[in-house]
Amino acid sequence: DHRFRDLKTLAQQYPDKLQASVIQFYLFEADFSLMLAKKAISSGDRYYLSGHIFRMVSALNQVIFAKNKVYFLNEKKAIKRIDRFEFAPSKYEDRINEIFGSLYEEGGPTIGLLEVLLADVQNLISFY
């Protein structure tokens, strides 16, 4: 049926307006989550802190998928996929694992790692 084929062809394309909207929304979301993570550090509540870190990374994943015009379906294996994208921060998976691994270390996660990661994604968006 040609109607199904036509719809399938349309769905395979990633619209520019969707890309711009996803990038704008989720960059804000990542920045907002980073701000809340910074506040949560001093509380010692690692559950609350880890929630904001997960939220920030999930938002960055959305941005990177959109930059590459790939539909984001879920978090499963997202960071592995990102490392293979044309537009991606270097060693993304390793950096994310380092951030989450630091939750269990004395002093908790380094906010600096999150700040640098966000800046790298912002540069990725503005550079290309």
Regions found by a protein language model. Give the residues of each.
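A nucleotide- and high-energy phosphate-metabolite-utilizing enzyme signature
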Residues: 20-26, 75, 122-125
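Terminal (often C-terminal) interaction modules
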Residues: 37, 88-128
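Short, charged amphipathic alpha-helical segments flanked by flexible coils
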Residues: 68-97
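Small-residue-rich helix-loop
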Residues: 52-59, 64, 75-76, 80-81
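Conserved NTP/Mg2+-binding pocket subregion across the NTase superfamily
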Residues: 1-41
